[in-house]
Amino acid sequence: MLATSRRVLVSILAVGAVLAPAMPAQASSPAPTPIGRGDLRPLRPKLPPGPSTLASYTLLAPVSVSPSQLVARAVLKPGTNCPALATTKKVGTQTISRNYPMLERTVGPKARTAFATVKVCSAAIPAGITSASVGGRTVPAAIPANVNRIGIMADTGCRVEPGRIQDCAKAWPLAQISARLAAQKPQVILDPGDYYYRESACPTTDWAKCGANPPVTPVAGMPFKDSSNGWMTDAIKPMSTMFPVAPIAFLRGNHEACDRAGNGFFLFLDPRPTTASTCEPVAVGAHPVPASPAVTDTWAFAFSVAPGRRLKVAMVDSAYGTDDKVTNWVPTQNKAYKQAAAVTTKQAGWESWLMTHRPIFGRQAGNGFAPNFTPWVSNDQAAASRNLLGNYQMILSSHIHLMQAVQIKGQPPNLVVGNGGTMLDANTTYPIPNFGPLAKNTGQPIDPQYPPYPKASSIWTKVAFGFGIATAAASKNSWNFSMQGPGGNVFGTCALVNPTGTAPNLGCK
């Protein structure tokens, strides 16, 4: 049986090589090409996952990258060839089978020492595909005709840093959350960021909590915290139960800044073909330094919710900036929010969500007594997005490690889902502050250039591990949210209601 499977596999790859033109090794995915009569051939038998394929998954992507808005990615053992993206397509009564080449994706040369234990391959998924697999593993092949069930999770990695060691072995629920979310059968999954928390070597005294095989530790000589071993342990393996279920939109968080885990984020999770080396260190004398802070371009994807109803999600990079004050980062960040506003111009029949890691309206723990204290997060984002939020029915964020919904009159509500597995924030009360975002405790502006927002009309907070499921309501612009724990218990429900399309309200209980 094994010999037969090998002969079938060799035959498949040989046919794929004839049908697909040879392409140079580069980081970009090939443009999909039409399937012609010469591509007709019998449907191949399904093969077991290849032993060299460690993971395969589908990323949501901008249409400029893939007309289907989907990119297939594979993580392999080093020293192996990129597999083919194997697809089928229905044409009338016939099933057409075709292989597409996947191309290697690499971090910049100065970061490669830290990522030598894997090989990553990528390919745009052509539009109209019925099924797809990589290395024998099924991956989502198409966005459903109507998407009315969305999974949401974020802030997932296991925290390992001096003074704060999470029990990764027994009390880190990411794998359980991923499996439970997958069982809910979402049609797409949204993840606003923060995947990598193992930023220090596990102390020998805490090996029972955070030890890993192979060990996860920053690589000597690298001016950043992550590695391929770390990404496999902290994200790829525990999330893998979700991969066959739905395409995922990944956005980087502050933990994926270039001096932390940015190299791995752009290698594994960013869908764009030109971003893999975004965080390559810069040579300064004998020692490399992290790439300078920068905001990557805003991008968006869209899908149908129901006939006459479509949703667009704008993806804004907020990995950098400051939470508790307004800084000179605001003009740089402002460009990303302007780009998002431009791609979500209001149209009849369209709804828009803004997805950005740092909340624009988020309530952190504590009340503070110092005049300059503010309980609001993140003030750089609130300032940078000022007067640019009118297109959205909702803002989706994470960053603070809890689940929260904040409503401010005249603004889209901010849903925070930052409870996907990393160490939670304080389990205390989160009352409505006396003043709105961009205000000090005294009510005065944090920065005179940016007037404070009104006092919040409602804040709902739950400090518990879990995820969210958004289900489209019958009315346009309206969604229902179920907030669930790792075991499937529902600990909160929310309703996003916006009957006129101009006054969204998110009520939770």
Question: Where are the regions that the model predicts?
Answer:
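Extended active-site neighborhood of metal-dependent phosphoesterases/phosphodiesterases
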Residues: S133, A208-A342, K346, A370-P375, ...
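Active-site-proximal beta-strand elements of phosphoester/diester hydrolases
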Residues: V147-I165, R310-G321, W353-H357, P412-N419
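Short acidic, glycine-rich surface-loop motifs adjacent to enzyme active sites
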Residues: P192, Y196, T344-A365
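Conserved, compact domain cores that house catalytic/ligand-binding motifs in diverse enzymes
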Residues: N146-L251, E256-A257
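Bacterial N-terminal signal peptides that target proteins for export
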Residues: M1-I12
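Acidic, histidine-bearing metal-coordination/catalytic regions of metal-dependent phosphoesterases
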Residues: V10, A20-R164, L174, A179-K185, ...
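Short, solvent-exposed loop/turn elements at domain surfaces
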Residues: C158-D167, R198, C258, T322-K325, ...
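Divalent metal-coordination and catalytic microenvironments
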Residues: A74, D155, I189, D194, ...
